[in-house]
Amino acid sequence: MELNFLWLILAIFLGTYVVLFGFLRKVNDWYYVSRLGEKKKSLPPGDMGWPLLGNMLSFIRAFQSSDPDAFVYNLVDRYGRTGVYKSHMFWSPSIVVTTPETCRRVLMDNEQFGRGNPESTKELLGKKTLALSNEEHKRLRKLTTNPFRGDKALTMYVGYIEDIVVDLLDEWAGMKKPIVFLFEMRKLAFKVIGHIVFGTTSDHLLELMEQYYTDLLLGLRSPAINIPGFAFYRALKARKLLVKLLQDVLEERKKMVGIEQQKGNRGMIDLLIEAEDENGKKLADENIIDLLIINLLAGHESSAHASMWAALYLYQHPEMLQKAKEEQEQILKRRPSTQKGLTLEEIKQMDYLAKVIDETMRRTSLFIPIFREAKVDTDINGYTVPKGWQVLVWTRGVHMDPEVHPNPKEFDPSRWDNRAKPGSYIPFGGGPWICPGADLTKLEIYIFLHYFLLYYKLELQNPDCPVAYLPVPRPSDNCIGKVIKVKNF
């Protein structure tokens, strides 16, 4: 009798679990999909996950494992290689695009796809600035892009970046204790972008800002929960401190406008202060500060991580390391005896290093997709993308797709011997909102690797350290090691 009663309880429990499980898995479908009416029939394959959380649990589980690409591979295994899937990601109904063709379509089509960001990103980077009209965005983009692009701009920065790299490498080599290589690379990159944005400012101020950016980055893709203990709470506090610092710098710069001594130390901040629209209206301080926050963030993360990973990959592949070194040695041999330091023309001759950098950026793609939003009901590959849904350009899905890049987990610079298929390499996005600092990022990596490969080596404290993928791919110890000088300049 007691045994039958236990079986009854177990059956009720299992039945309740199955019914509840099935009900909860359908809530998002009912809420977001059913309201679309006839359009729901032409939605791409996929599922909407759990209420509120959507598919974030399976996403986080994949990126906390040793196989972060399992998230996209699972979509392909379950629903086929459609290149477009419905989901619920980052707390919104979403369309995930994962092939070169679908990603390129979304990135290039400014008429049907606008900028889209999670609420946390809008709060932390500035709602008003992210919501600017297309025309206003184009005007400001031109203003903030000019300091980063073109041979004239890049030539101006070669010597400055070179000085920072040489000084810091020498400083690291002189340290008795191991350094946290990734953290030091971030400081290096932040010094560079700080010079471009401010023209000149104190090292202490840049160090403070770099510390605040660490918390800001962690909160960008977190749920907008402003409660102590959550990443967004810390990030919001960091933003407030950044805004205060930048407001002080802005006020000081406004006092310096037109002063002769200041003209040699101009940065992006001065261009933004002086900018006017067709009616002579200047930018509000709030917009200027938001633009500074965005450009400082974008200007140091990518170059720091890519520089670290390029060095690690080369040391893991001695034959590639030797080939990269020989290329740099040849550049020195061709250099006139009267020339001091690198030139942009020499950097353009680094063909093999260019492939190393491209392969590094492919192999270590961030987990964060590129966010867009459908402006109108539109069609991709015969599937409906509903107006207002966010569209996630899954760059890592493209970069780690074995049908696009054979043996994608292998580090193989030779895969770039041939021209890449359009849309198959998108570390900086594409279309109207392509990252304006792409050329500067690569310039920093070239200069760092040139000096590092010729004159230094890295001895890792934990050479078999596992890789962590959240919030960015990195050795779980953040690459602790000693930088050792092996040759004098």
Curated annotation (Swiss-Prot):
Its EC number is 1.14.14.-. InterPro entries: Cyt_P450 (IPR001128), Cyt_P450_E_grp-I (IPR002401), Cyt_P450_sf (IPR036396). It comes from the Eukaryota. One of its GO terms (biological process) is brassinosteroid biosynthetic process. It is a single-pass membrane protein. Pathway: Secondary metabolite biosynthesis; terpenoid biosynthesis. GO terms for molecular function: ent-kaurenoic acid monooxygenase activity; heme binding; iron ion binding. Keywords: Heme, Iron, Membrane, Metal-binding, Oxidoreductase, Transmembrane, Transmembrane helix. It is found in: Membrane. It is an enzyme of class 1 (oxidoreductase). It catalyses: melianol + reduced [NADPH--hemoprotein reductase] + O2 = 7,8-epoxymelianol + oxidized [NADPH--hemoprotein reductase] + H2O + H(+). Pfam families: p450. This is 7,8-epoxymelianol synthase CYP88A108. It comes from Melia azedarach. The lineage of its organism: Eukaryota, Viridiplantae, Streptophyta, Embryophyta, Tracheophyta.
